[in-house]
A protein has these predicted regions:
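N-terminal secretory signal peptides that target proteins for export/translocation
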Residues: 1-15
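Conserved serine DD-peptidase/penicillin-binding transpeptidase domain
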Residues: 41-42, 89-319
Length: 411
């Protein structure tokens, strides 16, 4: 009997020891790899100066390494990740921008824009194919861009000819840019789908460039008028007689007749993918302003867009300490911490596949003079996504050496 009790006791002790060993092995499995990764990442610390920050999370969202994570820094274009989330929240990933076409009693064609960021030459060409089934001739083309405030002044935007300074508006085409080159000393279009209209030649000559992509000006509503000129070109190419002028005006819904509503072929999710790929400042602020108009209708202003951003940051992401003045990241007045960017990345994880990517990294970069940033996700050896934020606000430094070590540590 005594021997039986002894055997039973040994079995109980063995089971408890086995359970303890399994628990220790489980803890080791859960935490040792992360501790090892954190140890590897600690070598990055000396690369992060007082005006820089880094944060790395694990696939569950837990922070495994950080330095200066609470410091508010200039994010540059990684801010577009946040702007995309704002638009996805207020507009919905399936949202499609619209443009309305009316006829008034005097046979004037009226066009009302609602901020479509991907209204392109080929789209206007397709629209004209539909419009020619509605009429054979028109008088004036009247352009209604009143859905957005005019002008919209974006902090950080200058009056240069560079595409990143393109102005925003409710009725714009080709990102408010013109792409040209010279052929036998004559200016011609540099893209087959877009004619080079005489309307833009003074602006091209003013740029003093032989070739390139320049922006149109907001002065005298040049950007809006260009949309009308391009539409007129495509209509006349299809033998529609245009007897009048290109004018700025308003649609009178109680008097004018809606003859066609163009619904964009591109969903907002597609637009966000384009934004992540090309980092277009114009697109970023178009979707921000449209988000503001959704939150506080009718009509879009930058102020409403910024308000929508702050609302989303505070109520949805629980971010309070955030300086947000526009959606593209071009303004140095935008400031955010790596910790707040981590919250943004956790929310954007469901859309990570919309970002630029290599074999292991999904990412968005940002750069201004003296500023280099990078944020996204690195796929670990077990397939999980590790969110990361690197913000370098020290002039003369880049993210290159940091990213090389980060990829190696998580490889």
């Amino acid at each position: 009997m005594q021997k039986l009790r002894s055997t039973s006791t040994h079995l109980i002790l063995f089971k408890k020891s086995a359970q303890l060993l399994l628990a220790l092995l489980w803890i080791f499995y859960l935490f040792f790899p992360k501790s090892l990764i954190a140890g590897n990442l600690s070598s990055l610390s000396h690369l992060i100066g007082n005006q820089d920050a880094i944060l790395v999370g694990d696939p569950t969202g837990r922070v495994i390494f950080s330095k200066n994570a609470q410091k508010k820094l200039i994010p540059a274009s990684i801010l577009k990740i946040f702007t995309s989330l704002v638009a996805l929240h207020f507009l919905g990933e399936g949202h499609r921008f619209t443009t309305d076409f009316y006829m008034d009693r005097d046979s004037n064609l009226k066009v009302k824009g609602y901020g479509d960021p991907l209204l392109l030459s080929e789209v206007l060409d397709e629209i004209s194919e539909i419009l020619i089934t509605k009429f054979e001739s028109i008088r004036d083309i009247v352009l209604d861009d009143t859905y957005f405030q005019h002008p919209i002044v974006i902090p950080g935007i200058t009056s240069s000819f560079e595409p990143y300074d393109a102005p925003n508006g409710a009725l714009c085409v080709n990102f408010n840019t013109v792409y040209f080159k010279q052929n036998n000393n004559i200016y011609v279009s540099a893209e087959p789908q877009t004619p080079l209209l005489p309307f833009v030649l003074p602006r091209i000559r003013q740029s003093a460039l032989d070739r390139g992509r320049i922006i149109l000006s907001n002065e005298k509503k040049e950007t809006t008028r260009y949309t009308g000129r391009l539409l007129q070109y495509f209509l006349e190419k299809k033998k529609v007689k245009s007897k009048g002028k290109i004018k700025i005006g308003r649609v009178l819904k109680e008097k004018d007749t809606l003859i066609f509503k163009y619904v964009s072929r591109y969903s907002l999710k597609h637009i966000v993918a384009e934004l992540m790929e090309y980092s277009n400042n114009f697109i970023a602020n178009q979707i921000l302003i449209a988000s503001g108009a959704k939150l506080d209708p009718p009509g879009g202003t930058l102020k409403k867009g910024v308000r929508a951003g702050h609302f989303f940051a505070k109520k949805i992401l629980k971010i309070d300490n955030f300086s947000f003045v526009e959606g593209s990241g071009i303004s140095r007045k935008n400031k955010i911490s790596a910790d707040s960017m981590h919250k943004i990345l956790k929310k954007f994880k469901a859309y990570h596949y919309l970002m630029r990517h290599t074999d292991r990294e999904f990412y968005k970069t940002g750069s201004l003079k003296g500023i280099h940033t990078r944020a996204g996700y690195i796929r670990g050896r077990k397939g999980g996504l590790y969110p990361f934020v690197v913000m370098i606000n020290t002039p003369g430094k880049t993210t290159d050496s940091i990213m090389a070590r980060l990829l190696a540590a998580l490889g």
